[in-house]
């Protein structure tokens, strides 16, 4: 792992990632205001207004409230930023989020050891059935992003990978960077005669779940030999824990390629491939191409959708929402109120941090659906996100796959 701590400041993440920073604890945030100049108290267009039960400048929780959460590493940099800034706005609310992977996050939420979980894959029916009936679960998409194939080839600034090529690399069938199939898609590229080292997630991972669901959708061979899931038996490669660990391993390993959330690659200056989409077009992962993908997907009423192989010439092929997991009912009224305030912040002021950190702001219609679902958690708080959130409402065309 990289040794220096990754710090979220006003405009960016520093260029080095560590597990410590991404498991960012806000228990000590009250004394760190001088280190972060981001203001979250001023009213801004699209942000929460005085229609909340407590008002935007004051959150009456009857004292200090601490929330604990655990789960996906995919949104961890963004959540860390949100929770840091939210603590500055409401010093009586402290949130500790541990980046442990989607699998562990779902498990800890189900067992009741945390107040909320996070997962890059919406919970399946069999997982929902394990949640205590008196608690229930809401799955709330809070942001979205691309999963990229980042690589370490110093002399190859750009790389195109056809669908059949990147699946064959991950299956171990293409073993060298100068393989004719890679060369054919990249004429003139200085592809080295070096072995390819695949880096994959060693922990239970929603990022892996999304990625392998896509691979299974486009490759019958992958589907039959490997399949999909938060953990799979990888045919080749080296495992690393978390998006943080995969990012570090790629950085340290010449000739490597691995899948990480776009923001991690962007903030750490990793190169990433253009991938061939369903329409046969090579698309570079950006906030814009991810937004194009989301515009082609209708999120159903239960807020669960799997985007496995999206339509559209401009769509990047591997994009996912990432979900916050909360109870429908909390026995502690103060925690219920705090959970709603946390969600409201994420849907309003927090969305403005999304593109900055490599994520995709929620379409306005999705933010409205999330607010409506979450507003039932506490009778003492009213989530207000305005008639138009500072997001880009898409024109939904294609339904997501429900489960």
For each feature predicted by the language model, list its residue ranges:
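C-terminal motif of bacterial Sec signal peptides marking the signal peptidase cleavage site
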Residues: 25-28
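Bacterial N-terminal signal peptides that target proteins for export
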Residues: 2-17
């Amino acid at each position: 792992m990289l040794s220096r701590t990754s710090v979220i400041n006003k405009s960016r993440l520093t260029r080095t990632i560590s597990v410590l920073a991404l498991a960012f604890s806000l228990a000590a945030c009250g004394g760190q205001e001088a280190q972060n100049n981001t203001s979250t108290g001023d009213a801004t267009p699209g942000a929460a207004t005085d229609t909340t039960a407590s008002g935007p400048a004051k959150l009456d929780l009857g004292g200090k409230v601490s929330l604990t959460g655990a789960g996906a590493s995919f949104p961890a940099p963004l959540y860390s930023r949100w929770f840091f800034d939210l603590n500055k706005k409401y010093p009586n609310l402290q949130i500790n989020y541990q980046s442990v992977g989607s699998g562990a996050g779902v498990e800890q939420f189900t067992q009741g050891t945390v107040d909320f979980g996070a997962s890059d894959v919406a919970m399946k029916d069999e997982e929902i059935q394990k949640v205590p009936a008196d608690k229930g679960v809401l799955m709330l998409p809070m942001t979205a992003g691309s999963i990229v194939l980042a690589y370490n080839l110093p002399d190859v600034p750009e790389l195109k990978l056809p669908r059949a090529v990147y699946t064959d690399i991950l299956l171990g069938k293409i073993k060298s960077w100068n393989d004719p199939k890679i060369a054919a898609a990249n004429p003139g590229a200085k592809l080295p005669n070096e072995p390819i080292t695949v880096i994959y997630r060693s922990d239970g991972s929603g990022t892996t779940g999304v990625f392998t669901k896509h691979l299974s959708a486009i490759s019958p061979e992958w589907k039959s030999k490997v399949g999909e899931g938060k953990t799979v038996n990888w045919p080749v490669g080296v495992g690393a824990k978390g998006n943080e660990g995969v990012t570090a391993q790629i950085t340290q390993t010449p000739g490597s390629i691995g899948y990480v959330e776009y923001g991690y690659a962007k903030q750490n200056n990793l190169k990433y491939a253009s991938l061939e989409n369903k329409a046969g077009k090579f698309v570079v992962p950006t906030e814009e191409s991810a937004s194009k993908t989301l515009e082609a997907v209708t999120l159903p009423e239960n807020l669960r959708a799997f985007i496995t192989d999206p339509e559209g010439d401009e769509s990047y092929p591997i994009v996912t929402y990432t979900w916050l997991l909360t109870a429908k009912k909390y026995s502690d009224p103060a925690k219920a109120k705090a959970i709603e305030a946390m969600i409201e912040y994420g849907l309003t002021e927090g969305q403005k941090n999304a593109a900055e950190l490599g994520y995709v702001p929620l379409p306005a219609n999705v933010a409205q659906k999330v607010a409506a679902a979450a507003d039932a958690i506490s009778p003492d708080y009213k989530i207000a996100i305005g008639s138009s959130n500072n997001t880009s409402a898409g024109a939904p065309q294609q339904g997501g796959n429900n489960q």
